């Protein structure tokens, strides 16, 4: 009789903000020794808003996962440049970001971030919003945020947010819209080591550092 394959027990994972306790301890110490009480309370309010938003828009997901998601990354600074990418649900946003950067032919030598759209001035703003998930090193200088190595691809509720903004290199400002295209079960012959992968694409990526004319 063939030996049975041992199944890996799945568990639920939901991202949590690191250093939250240290943040509150630092704020409480500062409240006792400063006259800038209103400014500090405002920072706490902003953090509570960020934390509430993430709690409502990130979901618990099973790890490991056999779900494969597809996204279309549409480059915004040049027409008709996009890539459809498939990735396992239990791979991280950091892995997805690194992959699209590499597929564009760029060096991963700058920070990146994903942004949830936000209503501003009567319209929808998709980049540099109040609700970001950034690479390690990204901070808003006020309070701790989630980072892309802590958030799984399947952690985001795409029924609420089928489009996210993505930015690589906050100086040269390479902007993308990331569109959720769907989810499927992995085939038994597919290996996670082969993901992420491009399944369709159009256009030619621009140079990472274009030549500017003085």
Where are these regions (language model features)?
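Short linear regulatory motifs enriched in tryptophan with gly/pro/ser
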Residues: 1-214
């Amino acid at each position: 009789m063939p030996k049975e394959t041992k199944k890996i027990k799945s568990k639920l994972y939901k991202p949590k903000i690191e250093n939250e306790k240290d943040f509150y301890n630092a704020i409480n110490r500062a409240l006792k020794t400063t006259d800038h009480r209103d400014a500090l309370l405002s920072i706490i309010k902003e953090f509570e808003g960020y934390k509430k938003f993430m709690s409502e828009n990130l979901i618990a997901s099973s790890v490991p996962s056999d779900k494969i998601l597809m996204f279309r990354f549409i480059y915004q600074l040049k027409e008709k440049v996009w890539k459809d990418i498939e990735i396992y649900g239990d791979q991280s946003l950091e892995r997805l970001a690194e992959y699209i950067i590499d597929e564009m032919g760029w060096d991963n030598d700058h920070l990146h971030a994903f942004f949830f759209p936000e209503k501003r001035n009567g319209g929808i703003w998709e980049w540099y919003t109040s609700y970001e998930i950034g690479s390690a090193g990204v901070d808003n200088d006020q309070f701790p945020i989630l980072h892309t190595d802590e958030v799984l691809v399947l952690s985001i509720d795409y029924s609420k947010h089928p489009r996210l903004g993505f930015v690589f290199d906050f100086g040269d400002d390479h902007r993308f819209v990331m569109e959720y295209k769907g989810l499927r079960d992995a085939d038994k012959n597919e290996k996670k080591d082969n993901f992420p992968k491009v399944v369709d694409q159009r256009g030619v990526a621009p140079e990472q550092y274009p030549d500017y004319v003085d």
